[in-house]
Amino acid sequence: MNRFELLNLLQDTIQDQLVVCNIGLPSQELYKINDRPNYFYMLGSMGLASSIGLGLSLAIKKNVISIDGDGSVLMNMNTLATIGNRAPANYTLLIVDNESYGSTGDQKTFTNERTSLKEVAIGAGCNNVIECSGEETNENLQKAVADKNN
């Protein structure tokens, strides 16, 4: 399953949550699939969608989902430590790992080798870190969103 198919699959789960989508192609794809007023497309700063989403979740009570790529997370790994230590219950970070910097020419990231973002997130103190692929992603996102609505 590619990123476009995954973003399309997630549309039934994402309802009124605020969504911050990362730079470039993912934002363009999400816009093409289903532009909504609760979507913010971070087009200008690689690595900052997770930081912006975290800031929103700290400022308001509404559920916030940041959709970030492995390349962007690798560009700003210190955000994982901040999320691990300060993220409120209304924040979800979804990392789409396609093992490449997709918006800059598909150069391979180190997740293609020995770097595990799951292990990095756990080491940074993030709770409830789930690694999944394909169709499992929507089910896991549904659970995460449902937990935040209780």
Placement of each model-derived feature along the sequence:
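Generic structural hydrophobic/aromatic packing signal, biased to beta-strands
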Residues: 10, 19-21, 83
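Thiamine diphosphate
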Residues: 3-6, 13, 32-150
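Acidic-glycine-rich active-site phosphate/pyrophosphate-binding loop
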Residues: 17-35
